[in-house]
Amino acid sequence: MTHYIQGQWHAGKGHDVASINPANAQTIWTGKTATAEQVNAAVDAAREAQFDWFMLGFDARLAIVEAYRSQLEANKAELAETIAQETGKPQWETATEVGAMIGKIALSAAAYNKRTGTEANDTPAGRAVIRHKPHGVVAVFGPYNFPGHLPNGHIVPALLAGNTVIFKPSELTPKVAELMVSLWDKAGLPAGVLNLVQGEVDTGKALASHPQLDGLFFTGSSRTGHFLHQQYAGHPGKILALEMGGNNPLIIKGVQDIKAAVHDILQSAYISSGQRCTCARRLYVEQGEQGDALIAMLAAAVKQIKVGPWNAQPQPFMGSMISETAAKGMVAAQTNLQNLGGVSLVELTHLEAGTGLVSPGLIDVTAIDVLPDEEYFGPLLQLVRYSDFDQAIKLANQTRYGLSAGLLADSREDYDYFLARIRAGIVNWNKQITGASGAAPFGGVGASGNHRASAFYAADYCAYPVASVEADAVSLPATLSPGLSL
């Protein structure tokens, strides 16, 4: 079991790949990558199945998707454990991920009907009908940080709309993908409707460049997303939905309950070991005694964050990062900021060689004139002290990204002022900025996306509108146009 094509499991014909548990360096999955020929076979299977899948109708498609939900519920413990082992996230967190996958079914069905259903109105010219049709064959590229929930958020609405899908997961989480697709198979999904190809860059390039794709839905790094955007330039007939990262700001202003503020900062910056695209990367705190008190409490709390393997008891708040390479990258990012003038208040450290386990870091970068506009994808929060609110907002907007932003403030006026001026697709007030709702759109501006918001708005990029004016019979108008005679 490695690749799923035309309703059958196939071994890969490419080179060997393995999945490593980043918390203990143990191999938990092995296989071979898909070749270009196997990618072709997957696309051909999806093309062959697409029209019949569409013609089943929404209700029949929904019944199969709901059968998949039943499979998720029946296998949620195994799926949560698989996600935990492959990503290093603690078990409490992967259980919530599987819960989000289950909840996505009802949300996607509601979004289909609200965003892309059918609407008819009688007009003097006839019956005006708006329908939505699937694009056809689409690819879904999944990330490693939420290897179940995020690709699920593309696949479910795509299938409900009548598309067929080729799923290419992250090469770091193949076991989760294999288990997910096996649950679709058990749900009775017709052959060819969902296909799985595993692999690294070569497999991804073969799929992304395939001429028979009608669209591609991507969640991942800004670098890869920009490459895909360039690749799709000159192909206006193909739909491209990009969900990328962010260099996200969180501003603190005039908060009396600093303990609650510290809690929201921790949840914004360090959950998932900082490996959420919405995580706070930059923290702006007012100068003065109140700001000093908040920072002292924050630094103490960061030092107390429990870090450990996915299965540690009692459970840690932070598990492993996705790999040892990622952990070393965060140490290097911290060193770079220190060399530029940053002062570590809490040092991020690589806890165990061969693993992705790191301790969280907090670094004061106020003295750095121009901060690197980078998404450091890990548990390292950059602190900036500010003198006035306008300065804080200006600094917060100094990024090419625009995914999430937040304000912790007791004043509603301050929030309204902030909301009008901040540039981001997700803006929260007195809530962690990693707390997105599946009943709302999810997406950013700038280098964070291409204006194809996902979550509840994923239905929008899974179908295109068809406008019709209809009548039950051909009929002459009461008055002919000038110059006509019959």
From Swiss-Prot:
The active site is at 243, 277. NAD(+) binds at residues 220-225. It catalyses: N-succinyl-L-glutamate 5-semialdehyde + NAD(+) + H2O = N-succinyl-L-glutamate + NADH + 2 H(+). Keywords: Arginine metabolism, NAD, Oxidoreductase. It is an enzyme of class 1 (oxidoreductase). One of its GO terms (molecular function) is succinylglutamate-semialdehyde dehydrogenase activity. Pathway: Amino-acid degradation; L-arginine degradation via AST pathway; L-glutamate and succinate from L-arginine: step 4/5. SUPFAM superfamilies: ALDH-like. PROSITE patterns: ALDEHYDE_DEHYDR_CYS, ALDEHYDE_DEHYDR_GLU. The keyword NAD applies. Its EC number is 1.2.1.71. Catalyzes the NAD-dependent reduction of succinylglutamate semialdehyde into succinylglutamate. Belongs to the aldehyde dehydrogenase family. AstD subfamily. This is N-succinylglutamate 5-semialdehyde dehydrogenase. It comes from Shewanella baltica (strain OS155 / ATCC BAA-1091). The gene is astD.
